[in-house]
Amino acid sequence: HSATCRPWMVKHGVRFQPSLSGALHTARTNAFFMGGGKALVNAYYRSAEKLGVQIHYNAEVDTVELDEGRFVAASVMHKLPDGSVRRERIEARTCVLAAGGFESNREWLREAWGQNERGEYPADQFLIRGTRFNQGVLLKHMLEQGADRIGDPTQAHMVAIDARAPLYDGGICTRIDCVSLGVVVNREARRFYDEGEDFWPKRYAIWGRLVAQQPGQVAYSIIDAKAVGRFMPPVFEGT
């Protein structure tokens, strides 16, 4: 339903930037909203409040009760300020599981990616630029209850990020944007892909996977003075 998605978002308070000019590739395929993710979430919270939606914080759904494949109830674990836990069972006619993936679950990532020919477990070196809380608890629970499994668990939106970034929650500012302006080599000083294969906004999301396939899951982007100032600079000091 992508054709109706943007009008639906506008209806619920999301404000979009005007289309980009001078960059046909991006302007025709992407829509950017004002204020970033925080503004998006705040708009949805305001809209949900007007609709009477109740939002529970520090509440983790860990099991879903089904009856012949149909939703019956969700079991919620409320974490209270004093450290104790209160259980609640919530019944509903329908349920939408918007619980995220398992990109922060090291054990699951290790299982999915396995061991490479060098004896390394690539997933052990991954830096997760998003939240540490996407553990895939409900995803695994539903698979155990017979939900259909589709796709390849190693497929993901994987960008090359600064090796100095924190283990979790570094955000978009950790992305390395100078790849297409120079040469990229692995720790053995070997090039392993065409850096200028296409317009950079169409290629940045493949570089995390490419780096993950290299020794030590690390690579180096080498640029000259002409490239300085032509990309989003790193937020970390040094080179």
Question: What is each stretch, according to the model?
Answer:
Residues 1-5, 33-41, 131-138, 177, ...:
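Generic structural signal for well-ordered, non-membrane alpha-helical segments
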Residues 1-88, 92, 105-108, 160-163:
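Conserved redox-cofactor binding core of oxidoreductases
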Residues 9, 16-18, 55-57, 97-98, ...:
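General beta-strand structural signal in soluble alpha/beta enzymes
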Residues 18, 66, 104, 110-111, ...:
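Generic structural "secondary-structure junction" signal
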Residues 36, 99-100, 181:
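Short glycine-rich loop/turn motifs that provide flexible caps or phosphate-binding loops at active sites
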Residues 83-84, 89-165:
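Glycine-rich loop(s) and the adjacent beta-strand/alpha-helix scaffold that form part
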Residues 139-141, 145-239:
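An anion/pyrophosphate-binding glycine-rich loop and adjacent beta-alpha core
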